[in-house]
From Swiss-Prot:
This is Vitelline membrane protein Vm34Ca. Belongs to the vitelline membrane protein family. The gene is Vm34Ca. Keywords: Secreted, Signal. Transmembrane segments: none annotated.
Length: 119
């Protein structure tokens, strides 16, 4: 048990020393690390700077702010066809409560397992 503790302590110490070496490589040839930032490039004086664009407010919308009211369509004529020689219009009303989207298929359909083939 003491041997495992000594070996793990040595490994931790070696990892700490290796990490400490990496911090001291600020000026190395691998990118410079976190040294001083590069100086800003000198401004170019070959042409005068363009004047900044003046701020222009956005144009007002061309549509009315209030929505246009659209009239409701007329109630359709529902005709009840029967064996009688006349057509009678059926008044519009709310649909009756039903089984929802299941409709007539609200029960599970029976599934029969086929008999295994005998060899």
């Amino acid at each position: 048990m003491k041997c495992i503790a000594i070996v793990s302590t040595i490994c931790l110490l070696a990892a700490f020393v290796a990490a400490d070496k990496e911090d001291k490589m600020l000026g190395s040839s691998y990118g410079g690390g976190y040294g001083k930032p590069a100086a800003a490039p000198a401004p170019s004086y070959s042409a005068p700077a363009a004047a900044p664009q003046a701020y222009a407010a956005p144009a007002a919308p061309s549509y009315a702010a209030a929505p246009v009211s659209i009239p409701a369509p007329p109630c359709p004529k529902n005709y009840l066809f029967s064996c009688q020689p006349n057509l009678a219009p059926v008044p519009c009303s709310a649909p009756a409560p039903s089984y929802g989207s299941a409709g007539a298929y609200s029960q599970y359909a029976p599934v029969y397992a086929p008999q295994p083939i005998q060899w």
